[in-house]
């Protein structure tokens, strides 16, 4: 399964490489200059470019047997669940391609059908090979001059990818991806010697269908159908000379940047699983969302938002025939520094789950008499701070020193490379907010903590920290009463919990408490000035 997922990511890179055929250029839009720049752009994606026949003359460039190939080495999950050396090779073959000067621009002509082969080798596993075809209907690509470089405009009625062959597994795999009413524009230029691009793209609809069947006695099948509407994407890249988008680590080290945002409308996901344990059907819809990703010297930023989600599960192994729930909004925002440095670097992680509303059938499993309030639950967490990064968190550029499946990997004193690599060290942690509400109770917290050099951790697994957290609790006594009434909590344990609550917190109202937890850095912990440790 891991190899197949690895192949899917490789397919995305292959499609991105084809998009580059309708992207970067620098000089005036003459056919030969555009072709030279297209080659440079493909190489920026990590592809080797070889043409069986290349004719440059007059106002046109004609290419035959154009082969784009790339090889990526690294590590992925092996068949035994451990990290293993891997190599992925992608090959695209274009029977013919051409660039022709027409009017005030250059028209790029690509085949209606392009074969793609993706081969993945993972140490200890059989190679996995995917072969398919990328097809375009009504594809138009035109290149014209812009103030700061070149403007590439491209559009197609339909773009599809269909899998023809799947080798390396006893099962069978069918895969079809479809993009409708796709259009976009790319502006290219230079910032010094750095290559820059600015892109905007949109599509009316995208769909994917996947079917996998394992014929073994303990096997089964998975059917997946996914659709989303109204895709709108924007992106920017700044790639220093000698770097490549295919190697984001090198790009970041050289001061480059890669960023992209995608907004989308209604989505639908249908999954049907059938196996020895029975059948399971999952359906999910949402009213839309957004995805953003960027990488640069300041780190990796990842953001995800989803609005109006609804999930339904049906299956023989479920405790009831159907489980369902809705979520008003979910979001994730993460910044992770990736380059080594002596100075502290900022990080953040924020997650929100608003309006989690469980269907009554789920509530009835553990609370059939509706003792607890069934209001939607919510979670909102935002943490930020600074940390030092002793070693790069991104892999070095792949090349001669990259691991190869079946070859001896470099080892340290203990025989395992990377096991003793120092982890990032926390310097400051700011708990901007922590807000959890469910079943009529609510917990809120905020505060700031700092690492103490040479101090004593307050708990195993934590660095020595000093600082204060302010905590507010409401509805806890009502929750304890409800759990006792439901028979989920013994009265003695409820009494003990109330006693601890009175010890570490002070009452601020009816079923409301507040507490200040202070860490001393020397291992001491106090609550409202009273020593806990």
What are these regions (language model features)?
Residues 28-533:
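Glycine-rich, small/hydroxylated-residue low-complexity segments
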